[in-house]
Amino acid sequence: VPIGSFQAVKHMLADVKVALEYARSHVYRAANSVARATEGRAVDVSMAKLAACEAANRASRVSLQVHGAIGYTYEQDVHIWMKRAWSLEAAFGNSVFHNQRLASGVIDRTIPAQSFGYISAEA
C-alpha cells in the first residue's frame, strides 16, 4: 500500500512541505541581506533562524510519527534528524533570543519597516 494512500499522512507531509518552503524563502532573504550588508540583516537572520528551526522540528516530529515505532529505534535514521533539529535550535542563539530580538526591535521601532515587507509610513 503506498504511503500516499493515507490521507492523514498526506496532510502531515503537506504541512512539513509548507513549513520548509516558508523557511527557505526566509533563508534566501537573510543570505541576500547579509551579502549586501543591508540595514535589516539582523532581522532577516532572526526570522530565518526561527523559521528554519520550526521547519526542522516539525519535519522531525512528523517523520517520527509517520515511521511509527520503528522511528524510535536505531534501525532508522530518524533519531539522527531529531538530534540535528534539536541542535539547530540551540545553535547561534535559541528561539527565545531571536524572538526577543524581533520583539524589542518592533517595540523600540528600530527595525526597518521594509524588513517585514511593508513600506514605511515615514517614506
Q: What is each model feature region?
A:
Residues V1-A123:
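Alpha-helical interface subdomain recognition
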